[in-house]
């Protein structure tokens, strides 16, 4: 029996690891590893290559949205170091960070899972016994077959994480084998619902396509705004691009809660109260309108601002005026014909209504209140009404930004463009996140700082756009049988209720088993105590992991997945990296670990679906690349193995250039006719908040004026760490020399008021949970706001866990977890 949680030693001490397995160069790079962990034997190396260093192609596949291309250096059968791979076409994409440099330490970590295990103690106690792969797979298959027979295929749910963004081994990666397994089995999917608001707002306003502006255009911007994100830590590969643009002449401005590295490198720092960025935008827009700095021509030609809205909140269309709608081309996404029924505008030139495409001068103002018997208002008039109450003075009272700075920002966006706006996920982590992003995107549209050279959104994302992902997921069996199709999606916020009550919205939902891969949900989802209840009450939990994560401790069956460099794969997520990255198998899998790809196939075969998994790595990647875009680019499995990287040249450097947005009418959306929430848990929806895409309300707990702040006076945010990505890299011991333990950063005035000194032990708590950690004093920290660098496991905290203090509720329409919208009280221990 193995007791994980009570173990005081993981096989390596820091001293023995550094002495026997690694040497740190002055730059912090791991230059050598040896097999010193118990049970780890050196691989048999080709004697003819003794002492010769081979270089294999690798990719960093964690979810940091960077996707760095790596060289994996192997000597005598062991990985000894990593370096940045060469990208000759665009060398500014060549990067490696401390996490990429420390991959060898992950490979040879004493925290690696070595063999399959079965739980023998209480869930979460970390008590397991060693079993064989045959036993593990047979037990999973027997349980799942029984559940399927008694309760149906939806009694099993997959939680597919984003911790491995690769097609063969990944979870959420486009067209992954895990998604194929789920589709074949008809299992449900538990949605992580992480960092959704940013992408939701962007796709809602600009249409379903990427908006990221390539670094090639950054040097042409007059201003670059880092707004609510921390690229110096969270997106290290991009930070030098910001600084390069600054050197080229762009003024760099950071809008943030706290003083950080980005601020130190910026020309101007605008501190703002937590989650009040939307109020700041309203103040900026108020000044823009007052000064007449809106880009009226852009609004007329490229947005819905001149569209006329009827009393039922739908647009006035030509069919309303007696012109029948027509059938248009088939929508590639839905497979159904589109409907051509043009929206109507008021044409200033002819003083009459016209289809938007035929009007000479679409009017923004001066429009009759009634047209052809319909009472109407243009979208622009409702935008002006929404902004009218938010003077710079009122906005300043809410967001804490001085009036003069609000006016300066208005001049920047309204008069001094082009402006590039950089946002990642920081603003995502509040209950009002969707309204914040809507407002910032509206600011860009109203001032014409998008769809033009060197203007737009710096941080985009989404699919690489080259794959046959649907063909992979729905691949028939070798006998021609079609897969069952995926089961229902379960929103994270609903999981505990389903597990506990065995129903959803009053109807039976007998969920019996959960399968987790590429994720650590205990540490990375909100309201940890509720997460743990879900894992304790689920009948059968299967976890597939590389290390003993917090989630792995709760598994009934624990499957050891190998490291990314121990198997062949392709990194497929694009985000800010427009290249496919081929991952060589540099060494054999250590211990008894197996590639995720093999594990998915083993499970599928044991479940009786072997004919659906009659493919090799080459077969699956080849099918994944069987797409029009890949063919146009000349990318095949063979070519990718040879070149190691492949550029999707169909991805544009400025996708929205010319003001062409990804909607049928080519215009940016500012009004939603039909409000459709992203999730349905029977919640009431106040649609008045959702029609005009320029609305704001305070956060739930981070709001300084929230009633809960009387009981819990401090809001808490959790910034990323330089040495970890979420909880990955927790097991790299020497990286803890840089970030040793969880801490809480306090503003000096707050610390004095609380009687807290540097190094004191403090407890942060609310009604949901608590965490005990060390205090540190930081003058750059905003008053009444505590910053706790996250990514630590529960057992690394003195007591409790940072993840326990967050709540698990969503905005009424957006399925978005709120990691920073949390208030606590502080107790000095």
Sequence positions of predicted segments:
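N-terminal leader/propeptide and maturation segments of large enzyme subunits in energy/redox metabolism
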Residues: 119-135, 293-403, 586-671, 738-740, ...
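Long, contiguous, secondary-structure-rich segments that constitute the structural scaffold
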Residues: 596-640, 727, 732-745, 749-829
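N-terminal export/assembly segments and adjacent metallocofactor-ligating motifs
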Residues: 2-297, 301-363, 375, 393-394, ...
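Conserved short loop/turn motifs at secondary-structure junctions
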Residues: 159-168, 394-401, 424-431, 463-464, ...
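Short beta-alpha connecting loops at secondary-structure transitions
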Residues: 266-272, 579-589
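Extended redox/cofactor-interaction regions of prokaryotic respiratory oxidoreductases
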Residues: 2-3, 172-243, 248-254, 279, ...
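Flexible glycine/proline-rich, aromatic-decorated loop/lid segments
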Residues: 261, 549-582
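Glycine-rich phosphate/diphosphate-binding loops that line cofactor/substrate pockets in enzymes
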Residues: 137-156, 214-222, 385-386, 407-420, ...
């Amino acid at each position: 029996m193995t007791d994980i949680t009570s173990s005081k030693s993981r096989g390596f001490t820091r001293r023995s690891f550094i002495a026997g397995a690694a040497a740190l160069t002055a730059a912090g790079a791991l230059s050598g590893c040896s097999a010193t962990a118990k049970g780890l034997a050196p691989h048999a190396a080709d004697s003819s290559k003794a002492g010769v260093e081979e270089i294999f192609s690798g990719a960093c596949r964690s979810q940091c949205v960077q996707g760095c291309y790596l060289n994996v250096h192997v000597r005598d059968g062991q990985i000894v170091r990593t370096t940045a791979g060469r990208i000759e076409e665009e060398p500014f994409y060549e990067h490696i960070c401390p996490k990429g440099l420390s991959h060898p330490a992950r490979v040879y970590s004493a925290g690696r899972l070595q063999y399959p295990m079965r739980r023998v103690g209480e869930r979460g106690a970390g008590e397991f016994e060693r079993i064989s792969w045959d036993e593990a797979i047979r037990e999973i298959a027997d349980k799942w077959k029984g559940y399927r027979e008694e309760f149906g295929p939806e009694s099993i749910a997959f939680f597919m994480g984003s911790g491995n963004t690769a097609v063969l081994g990944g979870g959420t990666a486009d067209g992954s084998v895990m998604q194929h397994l789920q589709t074949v089995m008809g299992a449900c999917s538990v949605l992580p619902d992480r960092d959704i608001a940013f992408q939701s707002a962007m796709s809602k306003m600009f249409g379903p396509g990427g908006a990221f502006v390539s670094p090639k255009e950054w040097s042409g911007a007059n201003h670059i705004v880092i707004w609510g994100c921390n690229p110096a830590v969270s997106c290290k590969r991009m930070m030098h691009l910001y600084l390069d643009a600054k050197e080229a002449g762009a003024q760099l401005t950071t809008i943030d809660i706290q003083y950080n590295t980005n601020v130190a490198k910026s020309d101007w720092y605008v501190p703002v109260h937590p989650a009040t960025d939307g109020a700041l935008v309203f103040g900026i827009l108020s000044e823009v309108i007052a000064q007449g700095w809106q880009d009226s021509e852009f609004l007329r030609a490229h947005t819905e601002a001149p569209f006329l809205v009827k009393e039922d909140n739908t647009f006035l269309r030509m069919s309303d005026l007696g012109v029948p709608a027509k059938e248009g081309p088939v929508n590639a996404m839905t497979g159904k014909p589109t409907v051509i029924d043009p929206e109507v505008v008021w044409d200033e030139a002819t003083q009459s209504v016209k289809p938007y495409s035929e009007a000479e001068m679409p009017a923004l103002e001066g429009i009759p209140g009634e047209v052809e018997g319909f009472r109407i208002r243009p979208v622009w008039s409702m935008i002006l009404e929404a902004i009218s109450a938010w003077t710079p003075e009122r906005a300043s009272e809410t967001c804490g930004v001085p009036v003069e700075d609000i006016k300066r920002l208005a001049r920047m966006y309204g008069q001094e463009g082009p402006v590039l706006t950089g946002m990642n996920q920081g603003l995502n982590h509040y209950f009002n996140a969707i309204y914040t992003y809507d407002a910032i995107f509206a600011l860009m549209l109203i001032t014409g700082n998008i769809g033009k050279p060197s203007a737009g959104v710096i941080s985009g994302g989404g699919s690489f756009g080259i794959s046959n992902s649907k063909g992979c997921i729905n691949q028939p069996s070798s006998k021609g049988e079609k897969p069952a199709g995926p089961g229902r999606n379960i929103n994270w916020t609903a999981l505990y209720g389903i597990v506990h009550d065995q129903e959803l919205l009053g109807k039976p939902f007998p969920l019996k088993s959960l399968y987790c891969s590429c994720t650590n949900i205990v540490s990375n989802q909100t309201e940890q105590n509720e997460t743990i209840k879900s894992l304790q009450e689920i009948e059968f939990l299967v976890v597939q992991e590389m290390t003993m994560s917090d989630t792995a401790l709760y598994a009934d069956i624990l499957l050891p997945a190998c490291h990314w460099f121990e198997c062949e794969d392709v990194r497929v997520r694009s985000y800010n990296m427009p290249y496919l990255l081929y991952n060589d198998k540099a060494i054999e899998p250590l211990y008894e670990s197996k590639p995720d790809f093999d594990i998915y196939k083993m499970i599928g075969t044991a479940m009786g679906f072997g004919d659906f998994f009659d493919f090799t790595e080459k077969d699956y990647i080849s099918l994944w690349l069987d797409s029009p875009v890949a063919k146009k680019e000349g990318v095949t499995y063979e070519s990718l193995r040879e070149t190691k990287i492949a550029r999707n040249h169909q991805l544009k450097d400025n996708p929205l250039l010319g003001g062409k947005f990804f909607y049928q009418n080519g215009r940016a959306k500012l009004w939603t006719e039909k409000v459709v929430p992203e999730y349905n848990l029977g919640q009431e929806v106040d649609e008045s908040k959702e029609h005009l895409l320029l609305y704001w309300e305070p956060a739930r707990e981070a709001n300084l004026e929230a009633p809960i702040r009387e009981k819990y006076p401090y809001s808490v945010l959790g910034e990323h760490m330089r040495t970890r990505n979420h909880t990955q890299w927790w097991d790299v011991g020497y990286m803890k020399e840089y970030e040793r333990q969880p801490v809480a950063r306090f503003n000096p005035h707050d610390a004095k008021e609380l009687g807290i000194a540097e190094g004191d032990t403090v407890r942060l708590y609310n009604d949901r949970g608590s965490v005990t950690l060390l205090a540190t004093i930081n003058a750059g920290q905003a008053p009444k706001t505590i910053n706790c660098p996250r990514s630590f496991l529960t057992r690394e905290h003195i007591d409790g866990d940072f993840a326990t203090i967050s709540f698990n509720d969503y905005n009424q329409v957006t399925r978005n977890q709120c990691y920073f919208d949390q208030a606590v009280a502080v107790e000095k221990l």
